[in-house]
């Protein structure tokens, strides 16, 4: 079976840095054998992070900034690929492909007036291809959207390859900046794989931490442990329109970013900062549980919930999730419990998607994104001859 060595590159909505997974993949399709060789996260320097944050702001962004940042990030992504190869003592010349998600600048999954559904990820693939002398596959979301999908979530295809079990029905819950869930029926089942965003992950928690505590995030949920849940704030959060929508659906910074947090802090400024952080942590947990109870558990018998992403390291958030699901008779694990990496999960996913595109295989899941059909994802950029 043909073997490919691929670097999956992911820069998510949390802006933690650039995640890079060096992966060995044997074959293609659902029978692929995937092995993680090495994973690293390369932090953004403060200047780049500041420019990304400015580019994400409708009020402060401009086309000149986005144009320049597109090339700067391409260089950052190329350097991150070189770094993962260096750490793994792996020759860059051996690398067959790079799958680059890019940095999402704006994602509009549904029509809004005269604005049609669209998405924009930057991090120029030509720069990556030139700097690494390696073929790059990028812009994975656009073809799904061209086919009528929301362009998200895209990880379900990789999750079926990695996590489908002969007898257990599993929920894969990713808690990154945004939270998304994939329902993976067992190998004997004729039920569909479904997936959708459940709302905020770390996004609101991190933004509140930065504004109220001058910290990038709540490490291990230690601050949230000290406060109490304020029902008035929780009710306000849980009334968000996104929670009332039916899947397939996706969301992002546009709904749960700076604007949401500014309004929340203005409205509830009389409450202690610890209580506010505890409550928005509970909001993330409750929004996940809400979607399970409304859209999944009435239709699927779930044996295991497997948590991944940076939020799985927040023990307060995980405990809130356990309490919310204590009556549902399903075991809850984090990725590390079953031999995988919570941090590397999405970067591995884009290595797998790059492999599928290389083999001309469709790799969106229409039941997850709402696309009219399965499509081959991504644009291919070749290195200089």
UniProtKB/Swiss-Prot annotation:
Ranges in a coiled coil: none
Gene Ontology molecular functions: ATP binding; kinase activity; phosphotransferase activity, alcohol group as acceptor
Binding-site list for ATP: 12-19
Pathway(s) served: Amino-sugar metabolism; 1,6-anhydro-N-acetylmuramate degradation; Cell wall biogenesis; peptidoglycan recycling
EC class of the enzyme, as a word: transferase
GO biological process, one term: amino sugar metabolic process
Catalyzed chemical reaction(s): 1,6-anhydro-N-acetyl-beta-muramate + ATP + H2O = N-acetyl-D-muramate 6-phosphate + ADP + H(+)
Taxonomic superkingdom: Bacteria
Alphabetized Pfam families for the sequence: AnmK (PF03702)
Swiss-Prot/TrEMBL keywords: ATP-binding, Carbohydrate metabolism, Kinase, Nucleotide-binding, Transferase
Transferase keyword on record: yes
EC number: 2.7.1.170
Summary of the function given for this chain in its UniProt record: Catalyzes the specific phosphorylation of 1,6-anhydro-N-acetylmuramic acid (anhMurNAc) with the simultaneous cleavage of the 1,6-anhydro ring, generating MurNAc-6-P. Is required for the utilization of anhMurNAc either imported from the medium or derived from its own cell wall murein, and thus plays a role in cell wall recycling.
Annotated PANTHER family: ANHYDRO-N-ACETYLMURAMIC ACID KINASE (PTHR30605:SF0)
Family: Belongs to the anhydro-N-acetylmuramic acid kinase family.
Protein name: Anhydro-N-acetylmuramic acid kinase
The species this protein was found in: Bacillus thuringiensis (strain Al Hakam)
Gene: anmK
């Amino acid at each position: 079976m043909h073997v490919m060595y691929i670097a999956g590159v992911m820069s998510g909505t949390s802006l933690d840095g650039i995640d890079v997974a060096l992966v060995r993949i044997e074959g293609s399709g659902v029978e692929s054998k995937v092995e993680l060789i090495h994973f690293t996260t390369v932090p953004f320097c403060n200047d780049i992070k500041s420019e990304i944050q400015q580019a994400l702001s409708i009020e402060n962004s401009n086309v000149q900034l986005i144009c320049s940042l597109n090339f700067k990030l391409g260089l950052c992504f190329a350097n991150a690929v070189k770094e993962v190869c260096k750490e793994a003592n792996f020759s860059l010349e051996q690398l067959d492909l790079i799958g680059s998600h890019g940095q999402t600048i704006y994602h509009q999954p549904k029509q809004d007036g005269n604005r049609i559904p669209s998405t924009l990820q930057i991090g120029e693939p030509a720069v990556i291809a030139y700097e690494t002398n390696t073929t790059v596959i990028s812009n994975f979301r656009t073809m799904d959207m061209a086919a009528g999908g929301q362009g998200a979530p895209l990880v379900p295809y990789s999750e079926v390859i990695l996590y489908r079990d002969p007898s257990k029905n599993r929920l894969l819950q990713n808690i990154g900046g945004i939270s998304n869930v994939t329902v993976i029926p067992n190998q004997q089942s004729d039920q569909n794989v479904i997936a959708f965003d459940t709302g905020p992950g770390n996004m609101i928690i991190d933004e509140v931490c930065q504004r109220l505590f001058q910290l990038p995030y709540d490490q291990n949920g230690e601050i949230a442990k000290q406060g109490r849940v304020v029902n008035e704030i929780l009710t306000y959060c849980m009334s968000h329109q996104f929670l009332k929508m039916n899947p397939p659906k996706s969301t992002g910074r546009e709904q749960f970013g700076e604007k949401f947090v500014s309004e929340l802090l203005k409205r509830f400024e009389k409450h202690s900062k610890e209580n506010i952080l505890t409550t928005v942590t509970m909001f993330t947990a409750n929004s996940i549980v809400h979607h399970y109870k409304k859209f999944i558990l009435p239709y699927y018998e779930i044996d295991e919930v497997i948590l991944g992403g940076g939020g799985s390291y927040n023990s307060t958030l995980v405990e809130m999730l356990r309490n919310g699901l204590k009556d549902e008779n399903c075991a809850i694990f984090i990725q590390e419990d079953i031999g995988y990496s919570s941090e590397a999960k999405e970067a591995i996913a884009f290595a797998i998607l790059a492999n599928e595109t290389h083999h001309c295989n469709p790799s969106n899941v229409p039941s997850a994104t709402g696309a009219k059909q399965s499509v081959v994802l991504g644009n291919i950029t070749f290195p200089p001859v």
